[in-house]
Amino acid sequence: MLTLTERLPQAAPADATLTLPFEVRQKSRFRATLDDGREVGVMLSRGEILRDGQCLQAGDGTVVRVHAAAEAVSTVRGDDGLALARACYHLGNRHVPLQIGAGFARYLHDHVLDDMLRGLGLEVVSEQAPFEPEPGAYGGGHGHTHSHDHSHQHDPAGHAHEH
């Protein structure tokens, strides 16, 4: 079985492709099937999400390009920047991984979040599309991972949700 162990710093000519959903692209060690049907093991250093177009290399020099799989997402589109900013605020306040693009915001499909945003007057479309969220909130960014089994204080002005 081919084992991919190195992230290449830039795109390179690929010998094969590997299409993965976001859930798997967050992991550093997993088994998968290349798009040509061959089995592959991935053993990378922790801390980075695999991005669409990123290339990985095996010890024998084989290069594999990663593709983001189309998956169930919810997309908020609009020309009203304030409405989109409001949507991003509410989703970010819930620590939802979020893809932000020109005129849209996208998250992994969640009917509860869809209903919340529709309640704010936004149009939400459920669709199949690649999901490439902003990198800051996970994979080396600021996570909110401290334990909540202890007493602590947050400045209410500096922290937007209750514990």
Curated annotation (Swiss-Prot):
Q: Which residues cross the membrane?
A: none
Predominantly, its location class is cytoplasm
Look up the domain of life of the source.
Bacteria
Q: Which SUPFAM superfamilies match?
A: Urease metallochaperone UreE, C-terminal domain (SSF69737), Urease metallochaperone UreE, N-terminal domain (SSF69287)
Region ranges (Disordered): 130-163
- Keyword annotations from UniProtKB, A to Z: Chaperone, Cytoplasm, Nickel, Nickel insertion
Q: Name one GO molecular function term.
A: unfolded protein binding
Q: Which GO terms describe its cellular component?
A: cytoplasm
**GO:BP terms for this protein?**
protein folding; protein-containing complex assembly; urea metabolic process
Localization recorded for this chain is: Cytoplasm
Keyword Chaperone in record: yes
Among NCBIfam families, the record links this protein to: PRK13261.1-1 (NF009751)
Purpose of the protein = Involved in urease metallocenter assembly. Binds nickel. Probably functions as a nickel donor during metallocenter assembly.
| HAMAP family assigned to the protein according to its UniProt record, in alphabetical order | UreE
Specify the protein name. Urease accessory protein UreE
Organism for this UniProt entry: Alkalilimnicola ehrlichii (strain ATCC BAA-1101 / DSM 17681 / MLHE-1)
- What is this protein's gene name? ureE
